[in-house]
Amino acid sequence: MSEETFTNTNQTSFESERSLKEFLKWRFTRKQPERIQIETSDDWKQLEQEPKYYAVWIGHSTYLLNNGGLTILTDPVFSKRASPFSIAGPKRLISPAISLKELPSIDIITVSHNHYDHLDIKSLKTLRKLNPDALFLVPKGDKRLLKKSGIENVKEFLWWEEVEIKNTKFTFTPVQHWSARGLRDRNKSLWGGWFMKSADISIYHAGDTGYSADFK
């Protein structure tokens, strides 16, 4: 594990001021919100007739995008739980609008940060099998995690680093957040948003963020 620790651009690191006791009290006494029924649509199946310029919200931070030259998938999470455990942890209330097997061929997969509700290794491994030529773009510090899972076609980025793919420039930008997948890796990998710019269209996907000077 890298010894490097990252902070936000304003030098904050989102260290929790709550004790474990306070967290557990909140966790087991909080009131669960009522489940909201969201109607899903199968209009996305018409994408084959509209081969470019579309954005489909699949769920949470997962979007299927096409900018006319590339098909892009952001923060792919298709598992039932955002957790390292299959029987515990936050469970999704609503199934993804599109299943992994229903997705079109994917060129680029972006990850904003390593929280389990944004970096789902099980989903990424399946996507690699379905799209062997897809390129994975991840924050600095997360490449090792993907390669350990057999995903080799990975590039990792610091803030403001960029890569151009088929006339689309991908730039990794600062956001106000933090990272961790366990108890001892807080802020050991970076977090950020993706700005995707081509000749015809610009797309920005922030992942998770609070408001900060980064957006001014």
Where are these regions (language model features)?
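Metallo-beta-lactamase
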Residues: 1-91, 96-102, 196-207
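Active-site metal-binding motif and surrounding structural segment of the metallo-beta-lactamase
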Residues: 3, 87-138, 153
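Short, polar loop motifs at secondary-structure junctions
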Residues: 59, 139-145, 158-160
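Active-site environment of divalent metal-dependent phosphoester hydrolases
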Residues: 115-119, 143-145, 161-164, 178-180, ...
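Active-site-proximal loop/helix segments of hydrolase catalytic cores
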Residues: 122, 179-216
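Binuclear metal-ion centers of metallo-dependent hydrolases, dominated by the metallo-beta-lactamase
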Residues: 135, 147-166
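Flexible, acidic/histidine-containing loops and adjacent segments that form or flank the divalent-metal
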Residues: 156, 162-183
